[in-house]
Amino acid sequence: MARLVSTALMRGLVRSSRAPRVAAVSQPAIQQFRNYSPGLGGDSRGSGDSSSTRVAADPDTHQDFQPTSKSSNMSFDDIVAQDIKENPVLIYMKGFPESPMCGFSALAVKVLKLYDVPISARDILGDLKLKECVKAHTNWPTFPQIFIKGEFVGGSDIILDMHQKGQLKDVLGDIAQKHEQKESS
């Protein structure tokens, strides 16, 4: 593959030195490269194929490897409402608490971990519909979005400010106590 691209580049450079027009790589070589390399054919997900793949259930295939349906009766609004209701500290963030994918999400997790509270999180990068639903629910355009005791608090800047002013300790105090009691039992 590298040889194909290299040869095409060299041919294009040689031609361009002879002709007044500039052409680095011939169109057929680019097309061959795109067909060979996944993710370069215009598919932003990196799969190289913009159409979905459907696999028919094969009776010879083990049940664990047969296709499954991902449909659910819950809407994204229901999922967000349930998340907020069931989790005392919830972050909608880029990545996960163990591996944040942006500095603001990392900062929010770092500040909340200072209080030894259980942190629940959802990665908004995994589902853009969920991301848009959360933004509509809070009317807040950026992430992370942090909920404490069912109330939207804000982003990492607000959590940091509350921490620096000593307000976060008051808000998270009873959650930390419940968490300690649960662990000691």
Curated annotation (Swiss-Prot):
A GO molecular-function descriptor: 2 iron, 2 sulfur cluster binding
InterPro entries in the cross-refs: Glutaredoxin, GRX_PICOT-like, Monothiol_GRX-rel, Thioredoxin-like_sf
Alphabetized PROSITE patterns for the sequence: GLUTAREDOXIN_2
Transit peptide: 1-36
Domain of life where this protein originates: Eukaryota
Alphabetized UniProt keyword annotations: 2Fe-2S, Iron, Iron-sulfur, Metal-binding, Mitochondrion, Redox-active center, Transit peptide
Gene3D superfamilies membership: Glutaredoxin
Disordered: region residues: 34-73
Compositional bias per record (Polar residues), positions renumbered to this chain: 64-73
Domain Glutaredoxin: 77-179
Pfam families: Glutaredoxin
Keyword Iron: yes
Record family assignment: Belongs to the glutaredoxin family. CGFS subfamily.
Physiological role: May only reduce GSH-thiol disulfides, but not protein disulfides.
Name of the molecule in the record: Monothiol glutaredoxin-S1, mitochondrial
Organism: Oryza sativa subsp. japonica (Rice)
Gene name, Swiss-Prot/TrEMBL: GRXS1
